[in-house]
Curated annotation (Swiss-Prot):
Region (Disordered) residue spans: 1-44
The family this protein is said to belong to: Belongs to the universal ribosomal protein uS4 family.
GO cellular component: small ribosomal subunit
UniProt-listed GO biological process terms: ribosomal small subunit biogenesis; translation
Pfam families: Ribosomal_S4, S4
Residues covered by the S4 RNA-binding domain: 92-154
Gene name of the encoded protein: rpsD
Sample GO molecular function, one term: structural constituent of ribosome
PROSITE patterns per the UniProt record, alphabetical: RIBOSOMAL_S4, S4
Protein name, per record: Small ribosomal subunit protein uS4
Keywords: Ribonucleoprotein, Ribosomal protein, RNA-binding, rRNA-binding
Amino acid sequence: MARYRGPKQKIARRFKEPIFGPSKALERKPYPPGQHGQSRRRRESEYAVQLKEKQKTKYTYGLLERQFKNLFDKASRMQGVTGEKLLILLEARLDNTVFRMGIARTRRQARQFVAHRHIMVNDEVVDIPSYEMSPDDVVSVKPSSQDLEVIQTNVEHRQRTFSWLEMDRQEMKGKFIDYPNREEIPENIDEQLIVELYSK
């Protein structure tokens, strides 16, 4: 299965949530796309609800099925609540960290920045979006990339801050302080549904 590159508005309308950020299309048409989007739909099965939650999470973080399942398997081997560990591992990806720090406007853009070698971790270029952050890792924009207008604009307009991250706009450098707690992660995801799906 290839990574989805189609209209993000359709995905947001399917899940009735702005999973890629503010969506004017969702505001105008807060119902699923398609000919029968506004019609009353029959009650979804338990499996359908669980599958939809998994798909929503995959789209939110930009993962393919194999990547997502591998991360779930890793979370299931960790001590603690599997669903919470899954979300924490998703948040600890380098592409997500670049997005949360405001270096990139979207996770898709963050993946591009990483893949195009604009991002450094502990002063070494890392071009793997799935790279897992560790506490006290320092993320920075490569010096030769700091003059890119798109990155400068993103950093300048960064608004949200997160307790597990530090960011110095002037230096274009931030720190992954520690793994976030579940309650600190703002995504509207019911991770227990995903655990139940994979437990079948």
